Amino acid sequence: MTVNTTHTLTRPERPAVIAGTKPRPGCAAGDAVLAYLRIQAHTLNTLESAVRADRFDSVHQMRVATRRLRAAFRTFGQIVLPADSEHLTAELHWLGRELGQARDAEVLAAHLRESLQPTPPELLIGPVQARVQGYFAPRRAAARAALLEALDSPRYTRLLAELDRVTAGPARGPLAGAPARDVLPAAVRHAFQQAKRRMRRARHTPAGPARDAALHQVRKSARRARYAAEAASLAEPGKQARRFARQMKKVQSVLGDQHDAVLARQAARDLGIGAHLAGENAFTYGLLQEREHQYAERRQADARHVWRRAARPRHRRWMNTAAG
């Protein structure tokens, strides 16, 4: 999907200038994980004003920071502290859901507009662009209003305070004092194994909505493995962890395309029904629905090849350095 990049967003500070985000070589697991959490918490705080101002891509970036934090707390709960991790995972899930409603409306509208671009004028029957705009504009407005309400809520204020408390350290989980080079690769390996199991399950799921749902679970697991590897890259072996994270990002990306097409297909169907009930010709929406179906099928096939490359043993050898 091509996204307008004519606007720019002030980026958060680079990790090197945020206090406590450069763990020493040979550091404990707690130090490495807290460093990663501080980077993401800083990003979350930095982006809030941009989200409130409706700056381009700010919701997406804040959502990514929220997901990274949530993935880290889920993956490294035995390092931070299980009780803190469980509570913050739930609260970050709430924030991510609010951000997601606003972001998904943006992405889906842009996806459908782009999908319509190559359609010959003679096949654009009726007020198609206006109907697409009318379908998504109120949804985006409602989602944005709900997001701003969430950012103004005491719940969000408490979440930021809890993040400040936990990231201030020290990490108090049972594995916090163990060497990062032993503990973190094992945690990434566990996240990867979950993605592997889900991919195997998706392959054996009959085509249709059930497989679409299964592939969406694979995508979430690949994203979690990617973010876990990013956190592990702050300790040894950093280069190998970053390489693995890039492979998981490829899996996440192709499955994201597939999922977007599934949602776009559903939206095209809803648009067609609305057009029909309004007495309009629904031909173009049927064309759009089939186009999205074909695209989803292609990206699903692509995902199998991308997964095979990403899951090669050479991308995972560094995980076997972990003790246990």
Regions found by a protein language model. Name each.
Residues 1-324:
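Cationic, histidine-enriched alpha-helical/coil surfaces that engage anionic ligands
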